[in-house]
């Protein structure tokens, strides 16, 4: 399966999940605690996942391989290898669908984007707190049609589905309510007491507490008043006057009887005289009840008369019933009227028929119910109020009208009530639409949609307004919507929205359109984001193992699966039992949460934790992402066999290409090879024997060790020291067997590994195959990696003791006794020496020529003679003498001649070129030795250089040991004039303080002057220390160590022997009180305390720096790993201008850049224009600049001015660079090879020195208003992440003349362009804290900073161009590295910057498929535009700058992005798009276990055949010269078809 070149990721369909599965897991059980065998249908079931034991079924009926493939009829287990349990999957069928949380919680949510739902809305639907409309039909909400996909709360759903009804409780204290039963009320209307209706609707009483029946009474009665006093008319209306009395009147009883009165209102009564009922013993109450007696007479008493009898009173005939005095006005009461008034013709009373309403109140208790509606007419004898107890029922005493009062509650509903006469045509619960028949043979029709409630008693049809529509909750609803989604229609709709004028709407439509197109193009069905079936991982990937004590340790996944299965089974059971909807809904929500926890625990809500601890369980997502996830832990970083680890110790006797491997370790590492050799030698006959032999006899049999020596003879091993910050962190060495248990390391490779011998450990690996061995030997051997890939300088160079020894040997002694004296002749000078007036090395003048007594006294005919004199003690190695060499006399020292011989011996056969390497005039310190190594590499090649280094190492160590140099406290010599310098400083300090007291300066100026004073004083003391050492103590061990570069820098020497000087506060600002003492003198308590500040800050910085630097390296590798040399020449005609200097603004002088800066800018680059020197020499266009060329250009910088070169920034190769644009491979000092992984090299070159960079934020001294300037590592990170700087400079946004107006707190800046229409319309406000760097009226260019501060690279891109942004980023990163003395070639930074600027933002998609606002690589826009037909509008774009993190995640390779950061987001996006990874970069190939498409992994190299010289001659090949690096293997990478430019999406 290694033969594939693309990998696609997509969303799995339910069918695909079932296809993967070998059976359904139905039970949550794992293994039986007694038998320890998997339970059937459980999470470890052998029938589903395969047998636990190789080729053995569960019951043991079938054993051995011969039954392979057979399924046991007894236990149902297939007989096969137990390895299948690592890849056989199962599945769980869910009782209800569940959403995949990745597509829900990703930002933006994929499901939400498609359905146009916000994250919050989608969550409400999925977790059962809102309904979503799936089929709206003709439902209405708030007067508008209901939309598909609209969310409804529980209440809204109930209201729309079943009608809105609200019940309002009326307190007992309310006597009566404000509204009548059946009245329409409006929102805010008072119903009763303080109760207010919250909606418009029909109000109905619920449980009235009392009823009042108004009976209509009408009886004939006498009006015993004189007829002449009454107004003569037949009828009297309510309130009409009956009579105005002119005399007193009395009404008397016509008969004897019991009085019964009817109240007619307003004191008017109808008096009935009734016959009394005789009481009997059994029914006293009945006897006393006058109603039951017969009416004997009725008398009408009008309003205005005074009644003189009481209810129930027994009176005699003639008794006074009522009276009225003269002048009284008698009238009909307002609640009654009179008709049929008859006046007697002769004698007798007036008779009238009186009509009135008699109100009878009936209390209603909870056991009673009203049978008629409020305001209904009742007839005499009608059952009005029913009751459980028949005797409590209320029967109407007469015809009348009933009113209900004091309801316990009022029901307000959106409904319409229709009264009917005939039979209704609908029944309770029916649904009707507008126009549907209700009753009366179809004459009564509904006006609204709704649900029917019949009131057969009152003969009413109530239509409660509601609608028949579908709305659901949970993933089931979402799945239905996704299933019905028409992507073509949606795309058309969104394309229309993209034409909207609103930018916000266009941005939203673009996001939705991208997702829609992704689903269309990938063939994914959107509904697959909802799971109906959950796959179950193979059991061996979620194992369960028995630990001590009989307990089981299990993978967290098993707990999560168990939880899911339990909930799923419970839901199935509840659904089959018909449980209430609320319970089912809750269970479905819990099932969704169980699926969420399994896929991504903790993504929503609080994570599921381990019982008994707070540790959250590791879900499937946790297995993928993070440092411990599958990508980074297992795919990109595997543990390998044939490896070991041990402490390292120095091996000074080793050659550069060797390392010492402990015997025991080698025995284990080379075991397979050893077995083979022992077998070949006949020591053993098989592997088993060989293994036994090694275990038992390895210490007693020499043959084992002899065989081991033979095995390792032509092998190399790899040594690695963590952290592996650059490629030199792993190098190959030939093993040398050593005693002990430590790995021995060559001292010179320590720098590359950053190793020291204070307990460091290193890992050792054995390349197994012949190809691996060959590759390791050719490309990784320590002696083949002498130059640093970062800057091309030797990284293997003499250091420490070696430098010290050689420096001591080649140093010249200079004595001061009699120095500078002039003598007429050599004899005079020697005479003075003999008299003791001169020392042997005192410089004197003889006949105007400088010499010394040593040079005059000693002239040796050859080096041997000089060295013999040293042995005899006549002279020292450092004495200045004359020595004849190759027929020429040199004024030098015996030491230098000895050094020359040492180098010559180290070079061996190539020692003839010694004069090009060793200069007898030079004292060899660190840099001189480094230059010598570089020269050797250039002239003599790698092998000779490795030999030279070994020779220098051996000689240097020997000399360092024999010289006996060491330091003691007495070697720290204080300068004699330190006291004077401090006294001067104190005097100046007093002046500054005095000026401040007098008000001549501000606090800020005083502080700055004090700091400057002490800085100057510290420098003066430092100079005094150095002068003292160089003049008086040139051979002081401390001075020698510092001067030679072996150990100790000038700052350390200054602090030891001079003064410590100013210290920093933790915030980086300077404390103005200096430490005057040196360490030699000792610090006072205060001085010690002051110094602890900075020291602690330093310690904290180092810890932080290491982590930040490592993370930066990782981000850089991720952004650039795909950049490989893929072509010979991309044909780019663009060039980058590299200025060699600049004109000083203040002096107007032209100043050249430093030599090292010019080197890191142009070394190894291809010229795009001729370079002409002042002497007429020309380097032609197309040449690559060697180090000699660069040094010559640096010398003639003023004449040349600038150089035009090709850089990776302008390279046109997709996902890589070409050889011409990249230039030299700095580690080989020659043009880069095809397939070189220059992106990774660039990332390592920038990241590896990151730890050396300071963390410091440079503070302006704690003074208010001074901004912080970010420096060091944070500044590098800020630049590579393209962040807005902390203190940002204001940049000119156009070319023109600047106009500055000053205000109190700010400047107002306006730029006048040459063309008036382009001038600034509004002024830019600049705070005064930012100092202006230009003056009013000055000419400025677009992109030019006009204030102090760091420029935002995005501004440069916007106002100027891509080139300006690129150069700025490169220069700013270099500024930080140079400030720390770190050399990194510009091209490495350019490779990274190119990756940051490869993106563009589409401003107008034109007729292409690209969308406005989309971020794509620029070649994609070009490709899309090229594909257009003539006349179509191409897409337009603007460049964008992405930080390295963003750029890494936006990459085309989903494997690379997912293994970097935000794994779930990347995989979600990629699977939605059905993204194909073309496996162009390195990481994706490493993940898949393929050879990387770089170096020897290139197809062109893999197809290359190895041939010896004879074969080459046979085929007539030209040159047969072999290269040390390729070991005689050559291939022509310029042949046609060797370009490996990838075609994305081909």
From Swiss-Prot:
Pfam families: RNA_pol_Rpb1_1 (PF04997), RNA_pol_Rpb1_2 (PF00623), RNA_pol_Rpb1_3 (PF04983), RNA_pol_Rpb1_4 (PF05000), RNA_pol_Rpb1_5 (PF04998), RPOC_hybrid (PF21668). Its EC number is 2.7.7.6. GO terms for molecular function: DNA binding; DNA-directed RNA polymerase activity; magnesium ion binding; zinc ion binding. Keywords: DNA-directed RNA polymerase, Magnesium, Metal-binding, Nucleotidyltransferase, Transcription, Transferase, Zinc. Binds 1 Mg(2+) ion per subunit. Residues 1536-1546 have a biased composition (Polar residues). Zn(2+) 1 binds at residues 57, 59, 72, 75. Mg(2+) binds at residues 756, 758, 760. It is an enzyme of class 2 (transferase). Residues 1512-1546 are annotated as: Disordered. GO terms for biological process: DNA-templated transcription. Zn(2+) 2 binds at residues 1130, 1211, 1218, 1221. GO terms for cellular component: DNA-directed RNA polymerase complex. It catalyses: RNA(n) + a ribonucleoside 5'-triphosphate = RNA(n+1) + diphosphate. InterPro entries: DNA-dir_RpoC_beta_prime, DNA-dir_RpoC_beta_prime_bact, RNA_pol_asu, RNA_pol_N, RNA_pol_Rpb1_1, RNA_pol_Rpb1_3, RNA_pol_Rpb1_3_sf, RNA_pol_Rpb1_4. PANTHER family: DNA-DIRECTED RNA POLYMERASE, DNA-DIRECTED RNA POLYMERASE SUBUNIT BETA. NCBIfam families: rpoC_TIGR. Belongs to the RNA polymerase beta' chain family. DNA-dependent RNA polymerase catalyzes the transcription of DNA into RNA using the four ribonucleoside triphosphates as substrates. The RNAP catalytic core consists of 2 alpha, 1 beta, 1 beta' and 1 omega subunit. When a sigma factor is associated with the core the holoenzyme is formed, which can initiate transcription. This is DNA-directed RNA polymerase subunit beta'. It comes from Deinococcus radiodurans (strain ATCC 13939 / DSM 20539 / JCM 16871 / CCUG 27074 / LMG 4051 / NBRC 15346 / NCIMB 9279 / VKM B-1422 / R1).
